[in-house]
Swiss-Prot record:
Subcellular location: Cell membrane
Segments passing through the bilayer: 14-34, 45-65, 91-111
One Pfam family recorded for the sequence: RDD
The protein's name in its UniProt record: Uncharacterized protein YckC
Phylogenetic placement of the source organism: Bacteria, Bacillati, Bacillota, Bacilli, Bacillales
GO CC annotation terms, alphabetical: plasma membrane
Lipid bilayer topology: Multi-pass membrane protein
Keyword entries, A-Z: Cell membrane, Membrane, Transmembrane, Transmembrane helix
Amino acid sequence: MNIYKPAGFWIRLGAALLDYIIVSVPLLLIYWLITGKDPNDSMFISLVVLLYSILLPMFWRGYLIGKRICGIRIVKKDGSQVSLLTMFLRVIVAGLVYCITFGLGLIASLILIAVREDKRTLHDLIAGTYVTYATPGEEELNADEEIRKSE
């Protein structure tokens, strides 16, 4: 496994905040304007954000809007594009782990990203992914270069 250009904590946090501002806040506001109900109690909003988090990276080469703006993306640990199963593991299963551990899993992720050279968090380890600065196709070029160097 060759982790190429891993993205650290601050850039990932920035991307998550951008996603919240660009995706969640408008959804919450629209929901509130249309229904007049508290959007924090809405399963609809949760479902839309969940589908966004799982499906968009599959169709947009590992990018979510915030990650795209920050120039980072999610890839499998071999550098290939994420799949439905990968994103399911990353979002749903890891989310359950974070809930079941009452946030201790999140603390573990913060420690992992700080101490691991590859910057992989708990949800990355569960899903077999990492977050990289590499653009689509760049990992393949790097892998080819590594092969040539070893010959």
